């Protein structure tokens, strides 16, 4: 079933500009309180100018362009500007440090980068020390360094015409994005997302929350995440609604922003709910127009009830991952909600619980959550240049192995039990244990290392490191945490350290993690 009618992203934006014209499409609020507004017509023109900018810099269909940006209008301009000329966006998590960012640049084959002055020194170092295909950098800031191969994004964009100059043939099967996501291995994998994937995500997510063109969808989720892109932005734009993108989440500012922009839909993770709940109660707690809060794992029933009661909202549970593009299991408007169920399979999807031999399990039995979709349409196409990893999770008939465990009841409601092996969920970020262990293992005093996730009242899970030192060595907490802060993104730095004489292992030499909780 083709629900997008062969419409790629270039056609989508041209049609939206024609249909909605001067209606507000995008509002961006910076952390400093600066607000930028764009109508559908204006936003399409900015997207066209950005597409022309990339064309003048030599970007053509199939080329990869990396974005290392916080939430800002330029992210939206670049995302769809690249799509209009058939180029491919590679968003980089704005929290990543040099080594991780360099690895994504190398493995995505990105030839151009758009970033800000905040991150530019890191990329100067990358260009000097790492082998990449990067040949040019555009900075979104006004002031520019006097370096070769660096241009002002804004100046170049403003010199471009508002009509598209380069329009190669496009197909909905063309790749629009490669989004690198943490996996159970030490390195992230590039999830290949097509024009069809993004168009479908817009329609699906708008259906999921019954979004109308007179509504406002506000998000504080980072634009480099699939949640912001496919659950929020694509839903809002596909419905002709207004999309509000806040640069940084602030528990103190959140409800004021919801009220100011008259938001009717938002999305959140447990960390957001918990930090909102510790704010002082206010008479304005219920003074808003939110009718649904899209919610992503994992919260106790007591926390859920307290949040809904205090703020007068409903949580609409949605379960998915980067590979599924959208929340393929979730609550449905007009349907009963059965907390702590994560809901039922959405339209265009099938879901099963399978055992270790890939056989379907009956209701009530715990196994792996598996999802059936259409590759490159309702689920991702493949892992970029990684057929082995693709074959490990995708069957030829479209069944995706999530690696998560759960069960279902007799009425088709699914329940999440545990997340995929060796992953830690921290404040909305997936953190690979193996990745952290490989970094920490480079410390000259450390002989053996394992990291685990432990329950955290605010950020889902905290990270605890268990280390065995080389004989005769001592290691202070200060030295350990300083080493981590210098070698990994802030959200990956462990919160706790325990030094042991030995780590528990089974007969095959694998660490028994459950003994370290």
Curated annotation (Swiss-Prot):
Keyword Ligase part of the UniProt annotation? yes
Q: Which PROSITE patterns match?
A: AMP_BINDING
Recorded source organism is Shigella dysenteriae serotype 1 (strain Sd197)
Q: What is this protein called?
A: Crotonobetaine/carnitine--CoA ligase
A Pfam short name = AMP-binding_C
Give the record's pathway: Amine and polyamine metabolism; carnitine metabolism
Give a yes or no for keyword Hydrolase in this entry. Answer: no
Query: Which NCBIfam families does its entry note?
Result: PRK08008.1
Report which superkingdom the organism of origin falls in: Bacteria
Family membership noted in the UniProt record: Belongs to the ATP-dependent AMP-binding enzyme family.
One annotated GO molecular function is: medium-chain fatty acid-CoA ligase activity
Q: Which reaction does it catalyse?
A: 4-(trimethylamino)butanoate + ATP + CoA = 4-(trimethylamino)butanoyl-CoA + AMP + diphosphate; crotonobetaine + ATP + CoA = crotonobetainyl-CoA + AMP + diphosphate; (R)-carnitine + ATP + CoA = (R)-carnitinyl-CoA + AMP + diphosphate
Q: What exactly does this protein do?
A: Catalyzes the transfer of CoA to carnitine, generating the initial carnitinyl-CoA needed for the CaiB reaction cycle. Also has activity toward crotonobetaine and gamma-butyrobetaine.
**What EC identifiers does the entry list?**
6.2.1.48
GO biological process terms, semicolon-separated: carnitine metabolic process; fatty acid metabolic process
Q: Which UniProt keywords apply?
A: Ligase
């Amino acid at each position: 079933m083709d629900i997008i009618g062969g419409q790629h992203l270039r056609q989508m934006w041209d049609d939206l500009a024609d249909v909605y014209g001067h209606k507000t499409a995008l509002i961006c609020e910076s952390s400093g309180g600066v607000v930028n507004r764009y109508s559908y017509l204006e936003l399409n023109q900015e997207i066209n100018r950005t597409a022309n900018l990339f064309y003048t810099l030599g970007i053509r269909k199939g080329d990869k362009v990396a974005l290392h940006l916080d939430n800002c209008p330029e992210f939206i301009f670049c995302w769809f500007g690249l799509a209009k000329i058939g180029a491919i966006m590679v968003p980089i998590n704005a929290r990543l440090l040099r080594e991780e960012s360099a690895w994504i640049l190398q493995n995505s084959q990105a030839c151009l980068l758009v970033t800000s002055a905040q991150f530019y020194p890191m990329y100067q170092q990358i260009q000097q020390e790492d082998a990449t295909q990067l040949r040019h950098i555009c900075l979104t800031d006004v002031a520019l360094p006097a370096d070769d191969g660096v241009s002002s994004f804004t100046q170049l964009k403003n010199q471009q015409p508002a009509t598209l100059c380069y329009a190669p043939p496009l197909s909905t099967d063309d790749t629009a994005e490669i989004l690198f996501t943490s996996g159970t291995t030490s390195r992230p994998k590039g999830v290949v997302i097509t024009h069809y994937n993004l168009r479908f995500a817009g329609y699906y997510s708008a259906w999921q929350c019954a979004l109308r063109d007179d509504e406002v969808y506000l998000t504080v989720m980072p634009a480099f995440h699939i949640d912001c892109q496919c659950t929020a932005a694509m839903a809002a734009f596909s419905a002709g609604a207004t999309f509000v993108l806040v640069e940084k989440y602030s528990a103190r500012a959140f409800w004021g922003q919801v009220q100011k922009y008259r938001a009717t839909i938002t999305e959140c993770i447990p960390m957001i709910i918990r930090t909102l709940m510790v704010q002082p109660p206010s008479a304005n707690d219920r003074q808003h127009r939110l009718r649904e809060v899209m919610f992503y794992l994992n919260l106790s029933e007591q926390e859920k009830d307290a949040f809904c009661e205090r703020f007068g909202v409903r949580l609409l549970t949605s379960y998915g991952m980067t590979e599924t593009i959208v929340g393929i299991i979730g609550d449905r408007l007009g349907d009963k909600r059965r907390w702590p169920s994560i809901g039922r399979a959405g339209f265009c999807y099938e879901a099963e619980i399978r055992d270790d031999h890939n056989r379907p399990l009956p209701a009530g039995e715990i196994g792996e959550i598996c999802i059936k979709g259409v590759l490159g349409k309702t689920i991702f196409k493949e892992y970029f240049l990684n057929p082995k990893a693709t074959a490990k999770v995708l069957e030829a008939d479209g069944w995706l192995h999530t690696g998560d465990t759960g069960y279902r009841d007799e009425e088709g409601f699914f329940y999440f039990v545990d997340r995929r092996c060796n992953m830690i969920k921290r404040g909305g970020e997936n953190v690979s244990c193996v990745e952290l262990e490989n970094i920490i293992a480079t410390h000259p005093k450390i002989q053996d290392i394992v990291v685990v996730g432990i329950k955290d009242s605010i950020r889902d899970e905290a990270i605890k490191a268990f280390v065995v030192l080389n004989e005769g060595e001592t290691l202070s907490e200060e030295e350990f945490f300083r080493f981590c802060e210098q070698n990994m993104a802030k959200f990956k730095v462990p919160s706790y350290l325990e030094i042991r004489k030995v780590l528990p292992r089974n007969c095959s030499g694998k660490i028994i993690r459950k003994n370290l909780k």
